[in-house]
């Protein structure tokens, strides 16, 4: 039955309720919130709040669509599997490999950020060694069991949540005029420096493209929930709470920032928005505090990148879209080959960075630029078609997308519009082209895989779980 959970013979159900709950929260708190928000603020000014609002609404819609499909058929392959079933094997194959590639690139990038911070604390140890040790340590943790990943991520996520909530409380006290250690209050900075939207709506759109990357990872909970005892309950809970999570962690914290510091403050991009607020409030060791928070965030992101990349590779293998060896598991029911190969691919990109021409590595990085939007587009199209398939088969739909199919079509149109805008904007043009070329390259391998595996990748998968 479509709505019935099919336990995998190879993956366990080691994630507890608290693990999945915290994973759903951690998924929307990426390191880019702390690192990249200053760039978005400098681009759009206080109107960056609109950029985060629009991007947040898009993620809420996407998560609702994804949850509708995930509750009906929980699967480690998540949207890649649903694209298989609703659009065709070629779609699930392509978006699955693109998504895997995205997280493979995240691994060395996040490891490098963490290593730079640690190197600033211990200058005697080279950056490359810190990066290597962090990556190998988290790889080892992911090899042990999914429970290890869940437990480690639980505490990292908890630290991030506490840090953001403390920042919001501190900022609220300052805005209301009750903070005794700095002469700052009110929200006049929202319009004092050129108005609320000083650079126009075009800048808001540019900032939204920057903020979009921050939300990538919200969908991980639908992958992780498949390795728990009651995936549909966890997915429903995570989806229903995504609105307040985005409101608190993004809108509230960014509001605090733009209300307390001028958006055009000198050095904002280099110092960072959150650290700038802490220094304004004369918080001692502001740089050390933010370095610690960023270190926790990038470690959490790196941990999730290893987990997510390995599960997507495992799912592709189970569906016949990757070599069979990538679907092997160990005694802990962990896809160890997928974990090791994902880590190996990440190390390979580092080698390319050092030895290949700079243009090659730039293409590799740019090729991940529009993957988030492609993932969202595939989710929307899959949900549009999956609902009809479910209804035709008389399957139970426990969680429904709002105002179907109108909101779904609106999301599809909006994402298409954004991709077209990116294509004609010099700052994002190369990202769209690089991602498009990579996607076309993957699609071109479909006939090769079809002959090798003797599969028909242009057909749709039957509606059954492949978890």
Q: Could you describe each region identified by the protein language model?
A:
Residues 155-156, 325-333, 373-430, 456-459, ...:
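C-terminal membrane-solvent junction of multi-pass transporters and transport-like membrane proteins
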Residues 1-36, 41-47, 59-64, 76, ...:
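Membrane-interface "cap" regions at the ends of multi-pass membrane proteins
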Residues 1-8, 81-84, 90, 111-131, ...:
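Helix-loop-helix connectors at the membrane interface of multi-pass transporters/channels
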Residues 75, 98-112, 215-228, 250, ...:
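Membrane-helix boundary/coupling elements in multi-pass transport proteins
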Residues 128-185, 216, 239-243, 365-378, ...:
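Membrane-interface loop-to-helix entry segments
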Residues 6-11, 48-49, 123-126, 158-291:
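Helix-loop-helix junctions that connect adjacent transmembrane segments
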Residues 81-82, 88, 120, 194, ...:
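TM-loop-TM module centered on a large, flexible mid-protein loop between adjacent transmembrane helices
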Residues 12, 25, 35-130, 134, ...:
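Extracellular loop-to-transmembrane helix junctions
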């Amino acid at each position: 039955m479509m709505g019935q959970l099919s336990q995998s013979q190879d993956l366990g159900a080691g994630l507890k309720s608290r693990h999945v709950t915290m994973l759903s929260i951690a998924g929307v708190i990426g390191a880019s919130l702390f690192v990249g928000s200053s760039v978005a603020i400098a681009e759009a000014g206080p109107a960056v709040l609109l950029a985060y609002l629009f991007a947040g609404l898009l993620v809420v819609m996407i998560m609702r669509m994804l949850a509708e499909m995930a509750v009906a058929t929980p699967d480690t392959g998540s949207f890649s599997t649903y694209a298989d079933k609703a659009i065709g094997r070629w779609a699930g194959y392509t978006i699955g490999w693109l998504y895997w590639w995205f997280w493979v690139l995240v691994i060395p990038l996040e490891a490098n950020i963490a290593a730079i911070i640690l190197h600033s604390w211990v200058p005697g140890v080279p950056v490359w060694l810190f990066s290597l040790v962090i990556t190998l340590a988290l790889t080892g943790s992911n090899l042990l069991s999914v429970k290890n990943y869940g437990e480690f991520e639980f505490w990292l996520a908890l630290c991030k949540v506490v840090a953001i909530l403390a920042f919001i409380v501190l900022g609220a006290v300052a805005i209301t005029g009750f903070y005794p250690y700095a002469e700052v209050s009110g929200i006049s900075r929202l319009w004092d420096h050129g108005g609320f939207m000083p650079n126009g709506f075009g800048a808001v759109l540019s900032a939204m493209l920057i903020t979009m990357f921050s939300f990538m990872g919200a969908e991980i909970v639908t992958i992780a929930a498949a390795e728990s005892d009651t995936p549909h309950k966890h997915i429903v809970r995570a989806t229903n709470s995504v609105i307040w999570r985005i409101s608190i962690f993004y809108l509230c914290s960014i509001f605090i920032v733009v209300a307390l510091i001028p958006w055009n403050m000198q050095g904002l991009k280099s110092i960072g928005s959150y650290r700038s607020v802490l220094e304004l409030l004369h918080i001692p060791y502001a740089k050390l505090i933010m370095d610690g928070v960023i270190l926790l965030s990038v470690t959490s992101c790196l941990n999730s990148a290893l987990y997510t990349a390995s599960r997507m590779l495992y799912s592709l293998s189970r569906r016949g879209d990757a070599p069979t060896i990538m679907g092997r598991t160990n005694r802990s029911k962990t896809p160890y080959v997928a974990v090791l190969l994902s880590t190996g691919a990440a190390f390979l990109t580092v080698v390319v960075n050092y030895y290949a021409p700079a243009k090659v590595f730039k293409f590799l990085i740019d090729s991940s630029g529009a993957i988030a939007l492609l993932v969202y587009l595939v989710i929307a199209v899959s949900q549009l078609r999956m609902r009809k398939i479910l209804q035709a088969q008389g399957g139970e739909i426990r969680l429904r997308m709002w105002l179907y199919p109108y909101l779904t079509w609106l999301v599809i149109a909006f994402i298409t519009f954004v991709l077209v805008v990116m294509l004609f904007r010099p700052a994002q043009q190369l990202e769209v082209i690089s991602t498009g070329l990579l996607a076309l390259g993957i699609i071109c391998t479909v006939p090769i895989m079809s002959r090798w595996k003797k599969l028909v990748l242009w057909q749709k998968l039957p509606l059954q779980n492949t978890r």
